[in-house]
Regions:
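ATP-dependent helicase/translocase motor core
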Residues: 1-65, 70-214
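Short, basic, low-complexity termini and linkers enriched in Ser/Thr/Gly/Pro
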Residues: 216-226
Length: 226
């Protein structure tokens, strides 16, 4: 069967079985829901296609994993490279490739600030997808009250605008640093990447969660363009 049928008849039921979109706070973002990782770009003469993940699994306000789907007649290994690419772009630790019959799980590992692996990357075949709670525990083994508060606070979507993937990564990275009590944070973004919008969303989440009821000093959220 083709990929659309494979997803509808084989992959979707496997996700529902373990609680996705059944457990409160769990969301499956798909191409049909217009989940676009990166918009298309004009490159010389031709226009490149936008990058769209087949599935992005979100729970408690955070994107936790990507699933690259292939039709059931194709070997599951053909989706692995794309699954890894999307995981790197979205900064999710876990990613999967599936043809509906088999599921290949990839743990992208954890790196320190210098890019050295703290937890090595691993791959293996699994019999099912993790539940929302399991995937959350895999991603965040230790509880962290402020991180969870920041995650659960929705972005300000006045005007119907959503953060692009790199803006969301920047917002989450800054808020993780705040949650970990890092005293000074420097956010460096290139010209034209939405520095003001990104800084606004950071401040929005800080104020809405009550992290600082007085004010956020600009020195604590240094935003510099390159």
């Amino acid at each position: 069967m083709d990929e659309t049928a494979t997803r509808r008849l084989k992959i979707d039921p496997k996700l529902y079985e373990v609680g996705w979109e059944q457990v409160p706070g769990s969301v499956i973002l798909t191409e049909q829901r217009a989940y676009e990782i990166a918009p298309g770009r004009v490159e010389r003469i031709k226009h490149s296609k936008p990058k769209k993940a087949d599935y992005v699994l979100e729970y408690q306000g955070r994107k936790l994993a990507v699933i690259e789907a292939k039709r059931d007649e194709v070997d599951v290994s053909e989706g692995v490279d794309q699954a890894k690419q999307y995981a790197e772009m979205l900064q999710t630790r876990f990613t999967y490739a599936s043809n509906g019959d088999r599921i290949w799980a990839i743990d992208m590992g954890v790196k320190d600030a210098k890019g050295n692996y703290i937890i090595p990357s691993t791959e293996k075949e699994v019999t099912r997808f993790p539940s929302p709670q399991e995937l959350w525990q895999m991603t965040y083994p230790e509880a962290h009250p402020w991180r969870d508060k920041f995650n659960l606070q929705p972005f300000n979507r006045d005007g119907g605008r959503n953060p692009r993937y790199y803006q969301e990564n920047a917002i989450n990275n800054v808020l993780n640093a705040v949650a970990n009590k890092q005293e000074r944070i420097l956010l460096t973004m290139a010209t034209g990447t939405g520095k003001t919008y990104t800084a606004f969303q950071i401040c929005w989440k800080l104020f809405q969660t009550g992290w600082n009821k007085d004010r956020v000093r600009s020195e604590e959220l240094g935003v510099r363009s390159e």
